Amino acid sequence: MKSQRIFITGSLVLAASAALTLAQAPAPRTGPGVQAAQDAKEPDVLKTCKVPPPAPAGRGPAPQGRGPAPPAGPREYTVTEIPGVIAAGQKWTEVWKADGNNADGIIATKDGGILLAQNDNSAVLKLDKDGKVSTVYSDTDTGGALTMSPKGVLYIASRGLNASIWELAPKRKMFANKYSGDSFDCIGGVLNDVMADSKGGVYFTQAGLFYADAKGVVTKYGENLRTNGVTLSPDEKTLYVTNGPTLAAFDVLKDGSLTNQREFAKLEGGGNGDGSAVDSMGRIYVSTNPGVQVISPEGKYLGLIPTPRGIITLAFSGPDKKTLYAVVLLREGDPPKQSDQIISIPMLAQGYKGRAK
């Protein structure tokens, strides 16, 4: 009888332990706020791919989506003069901060504010020039990057399951979600950055460089690229895309197709390129872990604008578009929690006014 009681007691303990383990196990992550690659339902999507994505090692060592891990805390920095770009001694100022993966793909608004995509919240916020915040779009399915064409058409990269590019304004509708008949998820990597042109198309990066024409038909361009940020010159004759520690360039043809791939510049300040933007003179600005790296339209390295932490994306806005904004990815506390910070700095250079970014 005693042995039976011990057996029953032991069984009850094991059952209770198993129940507690099940209760503590996190539910599978799926739905808005979860990037496709982390979604519990992604394996089912990948089973439908005619051409499956490459193994993770095939994406190369460059980070996909958020750039390099930041240092533990802020670092000392000194801004030196870059003629025509920034005066010596300028300082970065915090203008906004929020918990989670909730700031990326920033672009300017006409009134001097910025729009920012929120991954976790699946929303788009407007941060006005006075620091006031409002939600302008919701239900963006893990929106992670924004772009606006010179004609004012606003697009967002939705990074959730079955990633896609959506038009948000003037009319909300699907723009592109297939490559060679497959879901964008079959490409691999993360739907990263987007750049709209004046022809009605959108360039985007996702484990490579792609162009969705005005009808949403997608073509891939380039070889041996580890892409992240993408932008166009003010005259739209040249496309720039970050390629690890370098910046690549392509000539843009009349139909938006690309040719003449070349290494345009090395990021001499160190780190891999993430986001990018241009100013009114055609200079290119690349966000990296050391800070903002500035390159002339001829491909000459002009210098580094150091930042207190690594930055993942950037855009000109503010009065007369002479303020440079950047997004910092933070991990603070014990245990560390992710948050995002937007910082700004006064510039001599002026952002290109012909489009939002």
Predicted segments with their positions:
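Intrinsically disordered, low-complexity repeat segments enriched in small/polar residues
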Residues: 5, 9-12, 129
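Hydrophobic, aliphatic-enriched repeat segments that assemble into extended interaction scaffolds
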Residues: 1, 22-23
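Sequence-structural signature of mature extracellular/luminal beta-sheet repeat domains
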Residues: 25-357
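Positively charged n-region of N-terminal signal peptides that target proteins for export
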Residues: 1-5, 314
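Bacterial N-terminal signal peptides
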Residues: 9-21
